[in-house]
Design a protein with these regions (language model features):
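Small/aliphatic-rich secondary-structure junction motif
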Residues: 2-53, 60-65, 138-192, 212-217, ...
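A conditional alpha-helix N-cap/helix-loop micro-motif detector
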Residues: 20, 74, 105, 149, ...
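Short boundary motifs at domain starts and secondary-structure transition points
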Residues: 1-4, 128-135
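Gly/Ser-rich helix-loop-strand patches that form or flank binding pockets
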Residues: 82-132, 237-289
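A short acidic, glycine-rich active-site loop
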Residues: 190-202
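Hydrophobic alpha-helical membrane-association signature
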Residues: 23, 50, 152, 203-206, ...
């Protein structure tokens, strides 16, 4: 089974805004932690003034200059960033994001969230409470019953060790519909309770197997939680309630579009109201964009 780590090439989009310097410093810190090359993507015309300003900003980060590529692009921001990621074989794209989108921005989509919906490399969304500026203590990772989950959990463990995280919780969201319908009498209530108990036992055994596989990678202390609830919404609420520093989830099986926001996809619940920094893990670096 191929894994997307180690992250050898990371990228971030850089704009000349009040947040540019902070974004660059966050990205260079991550690049140094990973011993990775850094691609700085600027969507806009290349001018001597911009080149000079970028060179000054890079020099102030302390990163080795030969590990940084500045890539100027023209055109649509999202398309240009994704094309750069593909051409430069980026493993991890870093973007900043507001924790909560208003209704209009949710339906039209910010650039960061569009990248999450359309990207084909792993993506790290940094919120105002960044895992880089602050100590990373708790990581929550999706334990979905899906072929992608093992790699996602292993990636969370790999990145957690880089960040110096203290604990990982694998959260398995069980859709209540799979555990039986609402009971109308005592007999149905007992049958539903029994079905849910058996289902939880099966899921506990599956997650335990994941934990055993993590031991081979040298795992951070890990625990798991099985929760009956709406997928996406439940894990986001759990991460917020338990003050997680980083939430790690599977990538969507296909690019998300407007209909996924109208009829909410699992990931859209999290993107609409980020509980913390978010990493979306894509499985194969050969399909980057």
């Amino acid at each position: 089974m191929s894994v997307p780590f180690p992250f050898k090439t990371i990228a971030t989009a850089i704009a000349f805004s009040p947040y540019a310097e902070a974004n660059l410093h966050e990205s260079t810190r991550i690049a140094k932690m990973l011993d990775a090359n850094l691609v700085l993507i600027h969507v806009g015309a290349k001018t001597p003034e911009k080149v000079e300003q970028l060179e000054l900003m890079i020099s102030q980060t302390g990163i080795e200059r030969n590990k940084v590529l500045v890539d100027f692009r023209d055109g649509d921001a999202v398309k240009s960033i994704l094309e750069s990621c593909k051409e430069n074989k980026v493993n991890l794209l870093i973007a900043g994001a507001m924790k909560k989108e208003n209704l209009i921005r949710f339906y039209t989509g910010s650039i960061a969230r569009k990248l999450c919906r359309k990207g084909r490399c792993s993506i790290l969304l940094l919120t105002d409470r960044s895992v880089i500026r602050n100590k990373c203590r708790e990581i929550v990772v999706s334990g979905d019953n899906h072929d992608k989950t093992e790699v996602t959990v292993r990636t969370a463990n790999y990145f957690g060790k880089i960040l110096g995280a203290e604990h990982i919780t694998i959260v398995d969201e069980i859709d209540p519909k799979t555990g039986g319908n609402a009971a109308d009498d005592d007999a149905e209530l007992e049958a539903t309770a029994h079905k849910r108990k058996e289902l939880k036992k099966q899921e506990d055994e599956r997650i335990a197997q994941l934990e055993n596989k993590l031991e081979k990678d040298g795992s951070i202390p890990v625990g798991h939680k099985c929760i009956f609830g709406k997928p996406g919404y439940t894990i986001g609420h759990y991460a917020a309630a338990n003050k997680a520093d980083l939430l790690v989830m599977n990538s969507p099986d296909s690019s998300l579009g407007l209909m996924d926001r109208v009829f909410t996809h699992d990931l859209e619940y999290v993107l609409s109201d980020l509980p913390c920094c978010l990493m979306i893990v894509h499985q194969n670096e050969k399909t980057v964009a």
